[in-house]
Amino acid sequence: MSRPGPSAPRQLTLTEELEKLEQQITLTLQEIDSNFAKAHRIVTTSILPLVEQYGEHSRAVWEATKFWKQFFEASANVSLSGYEELVDGGETSPAEETAHDQEEEQTTAIHDHTQEPSQYTPRPQTSAGGHDTTTLSSVDDQSSVLYDRSRAAQQQPAQLQHHDDSSVLTDRDGDLAGSTPHAPPRGIKIEQQQQPQPAGDEMDIDMDEEDSELIFQQHTTRLLGETSRYYDDDHGFEQGEEEEDEEEEEEEEEEEEGGGGGEVGDDSVLGARSRSKNPVLHRMQNKTYRIMATPHKGISAVKPNTTSNRGVSPVRWKIQPTTPKIKQEDTEKKRPLWEDSPSSSPEPAPPQLRSAAFMSPMRLAYGGPKTSEKLQAAAKAIAAPRTPGVSVQTPAVGRKTKDVFGGVGMQSATKAIVDAKAAAKEKRKSILEEITWESDEDLGVSPPKTIQFAVPASRLMQTPAREASRRIVDDLLLTAGGGDLIEGSSEYSPSVVKMNQDIMDESF
């Protein structure tokens, strides 16, 4: 019996396709739910506890950070506000949101009222004196505007203090529909600055602005005239200070009297405001330090042969100040009588730096084209004081040690140096010839030498900077193999205690 062949798959109907799609959607939603539950379980059981634990651990760090933040703010006199408020209260409450929305509505309402004053028909407000301050008509009659200028000028400070009485947006009886509550204190400035001005006052404001521009131009031209007058004057800035200050004060008084004449109204108030905002240029000359580029000479001294000296900077010309020559007779006449007495002490010589202060006499004694000059410099350096604590560059005010070459001339000092070197060299050679290995063996073992640790101060070396630097250079030359260049210097390294040149002397 033969098996039937596979039949062709029949096409699904629309109902079956819809059911299949619904099953797939249901399975997908179930998978999404299971995944969401799994993620929620992971977040709540693993992540959130770790975050809370991290917050608890970092609380102390945040407290310390706030302390240092306040400390640096107080030390630098700076306030860094904003971050701490966001951290402490990051979520705004609904009440705060509504308050913020109300503030925005108030500012927009004030702006709309200043731009289009015809949309509102407020009832007339009465001030403390019982007079109408402002009366605005409806859309049909915008031209009839009554504005008490003198009252407004006098009651302007009262409006700042009692803003509730004179506010256009005030609606105590509920006459205005869609009115907003009072604006915060920061809205007062906006309303007062953008208060609707009547049509008649626009020309006055324009005139005041033109007057302020004219005053500014007058100040500028007067400044330019004053500076040119200063440069025209041959004596520079030294003459006419008091007269110019008096003229400036008189001009200020005349301007104040001219601006304050007439009735007291908005023109005078606005003119005073515009004048106060302008830079006070006419007071700048009072604080100018009049220092000439060339002292004790005017500008005319720059080019005496030319006719005009205006605009010439004295710095661009080379001026060589010449001091008047004083004759010897004049100095003798000006000298007081007590200086001529023989008992007066001579004037101390000015301090002079020793040219050979840092020259080593041992290095300068060998070779070179100017050997004699070097020897003289070395003799000067040796003649310097060797007291510790006394600087080499300062003059010898009071010498504590005996100056060996004080009364000897330069040639005798040089001769003494050469003789001392030759004697030291001969003595060293004789000592080295006497010491031999045979004599050391004959004497046997040398007895132990007792070292005295309490060294008296007289045995300590007195090494100023010059001698110490010379010893360091000699040691470096010995290490580098330049022992031939150093003759007459000590063969032993320097130590704290003075060394005996006589090696055979066993005394400490």
Swiss-Prot record:
Belongs to the DASH complex ASK1 family. Keywords: Cell cycle, Cell division, Centromere, Chromosome, Chromosome partition, Cytoplasm, Cytoskeleton, Kinetochore, Microtubule, Mitosis, Nucleus. Its main location: nucleus. This is DASH complex subunit ASK1. Residues 116-138 have a biased composition (Polar residues). Component of the DASH complex consisting of ASK1, DAD1, DAD2, DAD3, DAD4, DAM1, DUO1, HSK3, SPC19 and SPC34, with a stoichiometry of one copy of each subunit per complex. Multiple DASH complexes oligomerize to form a ring that encircles spindle microtubules and organizes the rod-like NDC80 complexes of the outer kinetochore. On cytoplasmic microtubules, DASH complexes appear to form patches instead of rings. Residues 201-213, 239-258 have a biased composition (Acidic residues). It is found in: Chromosome, Centromere, Kinetochore; Cytoplasm, Cytoskeleton, Spindle; Nucleus. Residues 161-175, 229-238, 326-338 have a biased composition (Basic and acidic residues). InterPro entries: DASH_Ask1 (IPR013964). Component of the DASH complex that connects microtubules with kinetochores and couples microtubule depolymerisation to chromosome movement; it is involved in retrieving kinetochores to the spindle poles before their re-orientation on the spindle in early mitosis and allows microtubule depolymerization to pull chromosomes apart and resist detachment during anaphase. One of its GO terms (cellular component) is mitotic spindle. The keyword Repressor does not apply. Residues 86-138, 150-355 are annotated as: Disordered.
